[in-house]
Amino acid sequence: LQSDGDIVDLDNASPVSFSMPADNYFVAFRSRNHLGVMTASAVALSGTPLALDMTTGAVATFGTNAQKVIGSTRVCWAGNVARAVQNQLQYIGAGNDRDPILVRVGSTTPNGVAAGYYFEDVTMDGIVSYVGAGNDRDPILVNVGGTTPNNVLVEQLP
């Protein structure tokens, strides 16, 4: 998954290919710290590359509230940091997605940062931060509802 939302092969350019017979398949994907998304119906796949744009709403997705809408673009819900509970976003309570961010930056120093490729990097900017502008904690709170931090957002995969 690239920062612009494209899903490409490991060379960062080629389409993703699967060594499977041509047929109709449900297409699902998930990224390191986002909730997964799946097509609502099977898609015809073959050896010919297919552009499957799930950002416009033209391709229906499985479940309810499977994607976040920003303007007119549909994106994956960000913040699935706590890998103990792989299928939901949760801001408070046991197994929440907020606490691992604090642990990554050093627990006792919430104003610290950690640079690198980490699950806790919700904003995918290469920096994990718990406080301050562009921190990785706030998007989780916003995604679960903002004013109700005890809400849980469940991934829409079977």
Language-model region placement:
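Cellulosome-associated attachment modules in secreted, modular CAZymes
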Residues: 1-158
